[in-house]
């Protein structure tokens, strides 16, 4: 972050951490708009520098940028509740073809197995 630009931005957004998060969000938006040809690419400046300069100049609404950031972090999908019990029973019927051997809670066969640790060296579980 350029020191002069960051110091100018501190007048608008006193918290540096908040400034970094908001400037990053705005830089990502700028980068997206440049890639989709919605705005012209400014010469020699990268999106983070442009976003800091625009925040320092007051050309960007900080409140709107915060709200945009919050909306982008929210979960987009909703979990649908199970309306009737018959649907869950249908799911159980889909797994009836599996033999009982596959559906077990017995892990005693793991005692004799060989495992590989993260370094790639073999070792036996004892």
From Swiss-Prot:
Subunit structure: The RNAP catalytic core consists of 2 alpha, 1 beta, 1 beta' and 1 omega subunit. When a sigma factor is associated with the core the holoenzyme is formed, which can initiate transcription.
Signal sequence range: none
Gene3D superfamilies hit by this protein: 3.90.940.10
Assigned protein family: Belongs to the RNA polymerase subunit omega family.
EC number: 2.7.7.6
Any one GO cellular component localisation term in the record: DNA-directed RNA polymerase complex
Cited SMART domains: RNA_pol_Rpb6
Coiled coil: none
Catalysis: reaction(s): RNA(n) + a ribonucleoside 5'-triphosphate = RNA(n+1) + diphosphate
The protein's name: DNA-directed RNA polymerase subunit omega
Biological role stated in the UniProt entry: Promotes RNA polymerase assembly. Latches the N- and C-terminal regions of the beta' subunit thereby facilitating its interaction with the beta and alpha subunits.
Disulfide bonds: none
GO function term, MF aspect, one: DNA binding
